[in-house]
């Protein structure tokens, strides 16, 4: 418990204590519920919500109920509040049947979900729907942002090159924080640029000799396995 939650200690003094976790989770739940009620144009009863929240806190503190593990880990954090609730999901699924129209976006979506810890399932319905192409390599430079979104966007760009012949710039990895540096948004430490460089090289090796061929089910599986 302490090992998984210490990065969310509000005072950054070490391991988050149980009462802090309970407060964070309950406040996060009710803040999310309040936003949803307002979005639907419904009435919010603050006094009733306070009573219910206090009861939920007491029951959680005494282990009469618990949210899922990801709820204990992520609910009420800035990550969920500022970057949607994707980090609360355990599993997701994405079909590749619309690969011909959505191209690299499908794999970028799966990569984004995987990078917030979601287990992602997929199919191979997109097999045979596009011809692999040679990217239009340019001398432009894309400085990859030091963020999950930056990594995902770079893979999206590369795959669109092979799926639609789009332009692919030179990738600049210099902005990515070094291995071992802290990751403040999602917690943990950085792996450095190495894994992303390896992913770009592996995807390029997979498709570079298949120009003109129809994408196969094996290609789809290999692409997602390289990403995941």
Indicate residue ranges for each PLM-predicted region:
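Extended catalytic cores of very large enzyme megasubunits
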Residues: 1-228
């Amino acid at each position: 418990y302490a090992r998984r939650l210490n990065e969310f200690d509000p005072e950054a003094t070490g391991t988050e204590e149980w009462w802090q976790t309970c407060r964070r989770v309950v406040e996060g739940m009710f803040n999310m519920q309040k936003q949803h009620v307002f979005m639907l144009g419904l009435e919010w009863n603050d006094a009733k919500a306070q009573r219910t929240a206090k009861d939920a806190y007491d029951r959680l503190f005494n282990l009469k109920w618990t949210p899922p593990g990801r709820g204990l880990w992520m609910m009420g954090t800035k990550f969920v509040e500022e970057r949607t609730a994707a980090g609360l999901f355990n599993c997701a699924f994405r079909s590749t049947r619309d690969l011909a129209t959505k191209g690299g976006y499908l794999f970028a979506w799966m990569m984004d979900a995987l990078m917030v810890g979601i287990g992602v399932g997929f199919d191979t319905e997109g097999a045979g729907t596009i011809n692999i192409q040679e990217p239009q390599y340019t001398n432009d430079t894309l400085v990859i942002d030091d963020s999950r979104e930056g990594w995902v966007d770079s893979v999206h760009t590369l795959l669109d090159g092979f799926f639609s012949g789009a332009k692919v710039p030179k990738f600049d990895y210099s902005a990515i924080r070094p291995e071992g540096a802290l990751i403040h948004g999602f917690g943990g430490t950085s792996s450095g640029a190495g894994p992303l460089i390896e992913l770009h090289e592996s995807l390029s090796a997979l498709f570079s000799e298949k120009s003109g061929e129809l994408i196969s089910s094996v290609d789809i599986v290999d692409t997602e396995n390289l990403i995941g």
